[in-house]
Amino acid sequence: MRSLIYRQLLYNSYSVDLSDEITNIGAEKKENVTVQLGEFAQSQYAPVSWGSGETLSGNVEEQTLDGPYAPDSSNLPSNCWYLVNPSNDGVVFSVTDNSTFWMFTYLVLPNTAQTNVTVNVMNETVNISIDNSGSTYRFVDYIKTSSTQAYGSRNYLNTAHRLQAYRRDGDGNISNYWGADTQGDLRVGTYSNPVPNAVINLNADFYVIPDSQQETCTEYIRGGLPAMQTTTYVTPISYAIRSQRIARPNEDIIISKASLWKEVQYNRDIVIRFVFANNIIKAGGLGYKWSEISYKANNYQYTYMRDGVEVVAHTTVSVNGVSVYNYNTGPLPTDFMIRNYDVLKESSFVYVDYWDDSQAFRNMVYVRSLNAELNQVRCEGGHYSFALPVGSWPVMQGGSVILTFDGVTLSTQFTDYVSLNSLRFRFRCAVSEPSFRVTGTRISNLYGLPAANPMGDQQYYEAAGRFSLILLVPSNDDYQTPIANSVTVRQDLERQLDEMRREFNELSANIALSQLIDLALLPLDMFSMFSGIQSTVEAAKTFATSVMKKFRKSDLAKSVNSLTDAITDAAGSISRSSTLRSVNSAASVWTDISDIVDSTDNVVAATATAAAKKFRVKEFTTEFNGVSFDDISAAVVKTKMSKLNVVDEEILPQIITEASEKFIPNRAYRLIDGEKVYEVTTEGKYFAYLTETFEEVVFDAERFAELVTDSPVISAIIDFKTIKNLNDNYGITREQALNMLRSDPKVLRSFINQNNPIIKNRIEQLILQCRI
């Protein structure tokens, strides 16, 4: 026997609904060729050529300096030059950490004779000596390095323009200008006494110059400020607009306007909050194994205040480029295992789709000049305990990444009710301390953020920043641009899928063994599999089509397709009465296994494991009257489907596809060579024994490699250890033994009807492995 349902799915999944395929390909092609690059990006609509509308004819020269600002005392940002322009003599600059560094600068006017002056600086009265016999201004730096010292002059700047500039680098070191602007020895000097968090006191009007424009700052020191520090209009324009406009963090600026359309620049401060979500799926068996710990997309809605107005925001977080790890302590059913778990690493990205109820998102269809700035976000993982039936629970703990803003694009965000045109903020991941580990295992000192508990003790993660964009919107503010994809969206699909998975797994305990074996012997084709779901034939056909579409992307279908076309054709046959087409290229298919004949245990185990993982596919190429693992898998699916309370056409195809991939992960296959049997498992175990006495003999790797290409593969429903245990405790005849080795359904049913505990326990263990 070989399950007919999987054969039909393998065959028909490649030819199902050709019209749907043509439609999909046509849609993709149409999307690629009709999008024309223009001034505006678009989220859904095709671009349209719009005029610029009414535009201003004046050319505006923006001021070079940012300022002037009034005197200030604060922890000014680092990596900027602060150009002071004092109008009077005296202290113009001071800074201290109150521990190891005190500094202030005193402006001495030209032609000042040597004299002593008393100044109040940094809550201290100080007596200093000043002297400037020249005709230029002199900025003198006074420094001390302990509270008991007296201030001494260190460096000075002679300048004709009453300008001095200061800068604090990332380490906190103070730099300013030394020398003289008239003698050509003007230079930048640095005091290597870090004061990273100290308050800087600027006692004069000052300008801010970016660090990248240091040369411009030097020119100002040497040649003075420009003659005019206001906006200059080169060509005459209307007096009504002759006012300097400074972009505010939150405002709407009309760039141009026509009768129907206008361009509006939206500037917004935003607070982005997001919550990671995960899928934690426990595998079948005794409760010691987990099949998947992965990230999944998650929606989050919140409110915050922007300029005194409450903003309702909605975010969707998703990840890309995660690293997938696994861990397995051994082959026993009681050995702890995590088949796959996701970790955010350096190659990973986090996407946060953001929408709020402000005017900026009301007409987000045609967009240009999109820019954004966001701060970093630190994400630290928490604890997750793996609840084992017996023994101490392993705990996954720790892990951290730092998310750095990497770009912004347009996106569409799906909620439970509508789809929203949003902004997608992309964050690049960088690993950070602490590392993560799983207590009681060898998993330790790994870096990244695992998906087990990515939120730690945080309710949400938050990033603050701003964005700016220009939209083409209707001139009438009451009109909202229709969005083509504003339709109801079923975002509860994932939740329903999880609920059906749980219900599907809970039904394993309610399956009668005799009923299961009888069902496994039936020719379960697609119609009989789905006919019990709906009352009409058309509904069953629709259901089967949906399952085939989903099954086409399953790992089993991909494995069949990747081996050879011959195997795919053979697996696709839906005839049970006649023999399947032989695989002419079988030898080439299994060359990678048959070539490995080294007799060492490690290589034999590797060879056996590699063969066992491919035997499921090869099993479809042969016709045998025994029960296969896929027969049991299909029977369990059919039994559980008939017990489900609610069946959804969108959800059940996913469940059936997952069942084909995840049901009975621990399988054993055997090859019979006369009086000798070779048996291998997907867990790396291998046996060779005699059919007469079940005595274990040496595993002949060379002979096994030959049998791989020529002999039929049999599912070891009753594996070697179970048969040996049955023979030792109950005794079985030679005929019963041979039928058991061939997985004869009649013999299995007879032992089950006799309530044989060994056989019943084996079948029950297989059913318990039928979990998703």
Curated annotation (Swiss-Prot):
Pfam families: Rota_VP4_MID, VP4_haemagglut, VP4_helical
Spike foot: region residues: 509-772
Region (Hydrophobic): 388-408
Protein name: Outer capsid protein VP4
Chain residue ranges for the region called Spike body and stalk (antigen domain): 247-478
The entry's keywords: Capsid protein, Coiled coil, Hemagglutinin, Host cell membrane, Host cytoplasm, Host cytoskeleton, Host endoplasmic reticulum, Host membrane, Host-virus interaction, Membrane, Outer capsid protein, Viral attachment to host cell, Viral penetration into host cytoplasm, Viral penetration via permeabilization of host membrane, Virion, Virus entry into host cell
Note: This strain probably does not use sialic acid to attach to the host cell.
HAMAP family: Rota_A_VP4, Rota_VP4
Domain of life assignment: Viruses
Site keyed Probable cleavage: positions: 245-246
Region span, Spike head: 65-225
Organism field: Rotavirus A (isolate RVA/Cow/United States/B223/1983/G10P8[11])
Residue ranges of coiled coil: 483-510
Site entry (Cleavage), positions: 232-233, 242-243
Motif (YGL motif): 447-449
Family, per entry: Belongs to the rotavirus VP4 family.
GO CC terms of this entry: host cell endoplasmic reticulum-Golgi intermediate compartment; host cell plasma membrane; host cell rough endoplasmic reticulum; host cytoskeleton; membrane; viral outer capsid
Keyword ATP-binding assigned: no
Annotated GO biological process: permeabilization of host organelle membrane involved in viral entry into host cell; virion attachment to host cell
Keyword Methyltransferase included in the entry's annotation: no
